[in-house]
Amino acid sequence: IGLVGSEMCIRDRGGIVGVLHQNPEDCVEKHVEDTLTAGAGLSDRSTVEYISEASDEVINDLIENGVDFDRNADGELTFTLEAAHSIRRILHAGGDATGRGITEALCREVRADENIVVMENAVAAELLVDSDQECKGVIVYNELTGEHEIVYTSALVLATGGLGQLYKYTTNPDGATGDGIDLAYNAGAIIQDMEFVQFHPTALALSPESKDRFLISEAVRGEGARLINNHGMEFMSKYHDKRELAPRDIVTRAIYSEMNKEHKFNVFLNASMIDHMKLFKRFPTISKRCGECGIDISAKPIPVAPAAHYSMGGIKASVEGRTSIRGLYAIGECASTGLHGANRLASNSLLECVVCACLLYTSPSPRDRSVS
């Protein structure tokens, strides 16, 4: 129910974590420690370990299902660096269009499966939960007919994304209004960690009035771009020894501090030191969007400011997607599994989506259990 291939994942211009055997310098232990550190020690270690260990298998499943991850001239997967990662382990598709690459490949599989009925132009209005706290279905509003319909279910999965549109400035699409969390809350599900909302440090900020904040992936900083203030001075060394590659919450607070000092609505991201051919090949979507705004990212700094980006909190769920209501499951950003703690590590979100979806699908007798 809903729009297949909606913008939530398509907008992901970062990548997906892959702790793979093809990358001998990396290991599960390193990824786990990076995740726990970024999450301010509030992540659930067992969840982090499980999802990290599963990454090799699910990445290869994605490849088998048609996701074309970027490779070098020798045909080997290329790994890139993003903030708070201790090693290059991020996979991309189409340079800076990883979310689109994964979503479009999986949507093709969905539409080709005769056993899957897709209901688009339909909005979930209310969950049907009985007196025993078991989900029996959902009331759906059909936007084409203007009528409400009841869909009875043996298992219902919420994968409704985040809530960035609750904020003035956000990188999220219009549909990111937290509706899935609201549906679950009204049905009596346990909601947790809603105080933890991540602000991405670098969203395109052309003016204070511009509310559509196009995401400038931190992968640009991973390739060497530097943050500068309105006087052209670098400043991140004052805030953290990893500079631009510090955890997102630290970089965001540093940018806000510089903006407040100068009474400005933005700072700038200077990518001119990156090889120009590499820059345009690696970030085609970003360079195109900035070009449409009159910014040649190889020569001119990009105006950026923090914007609401990701909710760590949501519907309390296990890694299999089980919630406190039997028969109701939640995966992705609307769920809160304990993976992200207080601050999500870059590119862990797509990995969580895929791992939890696979585990939900393969779990035996899911209806018999719930999360307390």
Regions found by a protein language model. Name each.
Residues 1-5, 10, 361-372:
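Single conserved hydrophobic/aromatic residue that forms the stacking wall/gate
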Residues 183, 189-296, 300-302:
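An anion/pyrophosphate-binding glycine-rich loop and adjacent beta-alpha core
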Residues 155-208, 214, 348-356:
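Glycine-rich loop(s) and the adjacent beta-strand/alpha-helix scaffold that form part
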Residues 6-7, 11-25:
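Conserved N-terminal glycine-rich FAD pyrophosphate-binding loop of Rossmann-like flavoproteins
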Residues 63-147, 152, 159, 203-207:
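Conserved redox-cofactor binding core of oxidoreductases
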Residues 47-53, 91-105, 171-173, 178, ...:
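Short beta-strand to alpha-helix junction loop
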Residues 325-343:
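Short FAD-binding loop at a beta-strand-to-alpha-helix junction that anchors the flavin cofactor
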Residues 310-330:
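FAD-binding beta-loop-beta segment adjacent to the flavin cofactor pocket
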